[in-house]
Amino acid sequence: MVEQAPYNDQDLLQPDNDFWRFSLRVYDQEGVANECLELQELHGVNVNLLLFCAWIGTQSITLDRNDIEAATQIVVHWDTMVVRPLRIARQEMKADPDMATVRARVKALEIEAEQIEQAMLFAHARRIRSADAHHGDAIAHNVNQCVAVATNAVLSEAAAPCLIKAARRKKS
């Protein structure tokens, strides 16, 4: 029996969703990109998963370790087989100025692949129910939990303070 994917084609055909728009707005704020990329490079944290945890926290939904592990399973194959190879290819071209045009095209494909990854997480969000609807700060809780799961650690302080601060800001 073939296991059905946790998303359907309709979800993937509509990657411009609330989560994607949140990510574009938040990621562009001061310090957020550097913070997220540092967590990715030093600790293997998936930036889209980190943004997902912050976004779902804006809806007062708190995630537990099992929720984050389930979300990770939704995207791990796509991230490993598509997003990361594109990222590696783009980074390899950085040193060669003659590759600037090709590098720009690869970067555009990488962003599209990340948008599809976010569409998978967005579709998954409908299945998540808050583990603790009364948690004081769902954004900080979820972001810290995401980093803790990725690093197999327990964090007592905010792992990504710029992201948490940016996610708390209302749309302008």
Predicted features along the sequence, with ranges:
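Residue-level detector of well-ordered alpha-helical segments, enriched
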Residues: 35, 45-51, 82-85, 102-105, ...
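Long, acidic, intrinsically disordered low-complexity segments
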Residues: 1-12, 129
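Acidic, glycine/proline-rich low-complexity segments that act as flexible tails and inter-domain linkers
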Residues: 2-3, 15-30, 167-172
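Short alpha-helix boundary/capping elements
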Residues: 44-48, 56-61, 79, 111-117, ...
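A charged, amphipathic interaction segment
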Residues: 91-170
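N-terminal interaction modules that seed assembly of large macromolecular complexes
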Residues: 32-69
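Short secondary-structure subsegments characteristic of cysteine-rich extracellular domains
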Residues: 63-85
